[in-house]
Amino acid sequence: MEIIHYIVIIMTLLSSLASLLQRDLIKCIILSGFAGLCMAYLYYALLAPDVALTEAILGGAILPALFAFTVRRTQRIDE
């Protein structure tokens, strides 16, 4: 394994841990989306391009956008 793979694994772990410890929900969503993109890279490095593409679309774009929309929507109602 190349050194870049280890760096991406560490970045994935750190961003996932940071999203668990984060109190601000928008920052948590951004960090979990970043972890999804890192996972997509790792799937691509493991020669699974179909899984990588699915993870990049869902875990890196659609779900964070949906979560951000939901958080914004519920915060407006609470205020």
Curated annotation (Swiss-Prot):
This is Uncharacterized protein MJ0437. One of its GO terms (cellular component) is plasma membrane. Keywords: Cell membrane, Membrane, Transmembrane, Transmembrane helix. The chain crosses the membrane at residues 28-48, 51-71. It is found in: Cell membrane. It is a multi-pass membrane protein.
